Amino acid sequence: MKNLDRLFVLTGLVFLLIGMALGLKMSATMDFTLHGLHAHLNLLGFVLMTLFGLCYRAWPKMVESKLATVHYFLHTVCVAVALFLLYFLLSNPELGPKIGPVMDGFLGGAYLGILIFAYLVLTRAKE
């Protein structure tokens, strides 16, 4: 996919804007119930997406694989859905038994995306 590195960084910025807005809301209301969501939006969303984008820029051979595009969509969709579910879980802990297993499935998908990224780094980031 063309400009995949830029797409990772731009998507990371979206996660950052949402995460920081949530942080500002928590600070303004002094209600830190969603602090775990705030942290994961910034780490899984912004930090990892930006790191992925910079790596794809540094090693363009990684982008030549169709797995790079799979990695982007897998990570983006799975993290977004998992964090959406985390919002409901933190807001309504009694939903844990119903939401938890579904969220775990999406986190497993995000982990699969990270495994794809690791494979691409190990096999294509040689120069």
Question: Which residues make up each language-model segment?
Answer:
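Hydrophobic alpha-helical transmembrane segments of multi-pass integral membrane proteins
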Residues: M1-E127
